[in-house]
Amino acid sequence: MSSAIQLRGLAWDHRRCWGPLEASVPAYRALQPDIQVAWNRRSLWEFGEGRLDGPAADYDLVIYDHPFVGEVARDGLMLDLMRFLSVDQIASFA
């Protein structure tokens, strides 16, 4: 039985979002082999036309585009990721 942590992520479907995300996956998997993230994509239009709290409730990780960040912050839909990382994990991003 696998002890890997399985997370669900949602990103907006534009190369500016998923390009860097996909490029970072191999390095992240090498550093964190016990954490698996299954990424889905949603059009920016779908983000703009729908409620933003839906994806926040349905996914572990959500990448919002900048026009929505104010609403996301106002509605408390973000958590400080640093609370969930070890000192070594944070240092690996430097």
Where are these regions (language model features)?
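Conserved N-terminal structural module of periplasmic/extracytoplasmic solute-binding proteins
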Residues: M1-V69
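Hinge/lid segment of periplasmic solute-binding proteins
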Residues: V69-A94
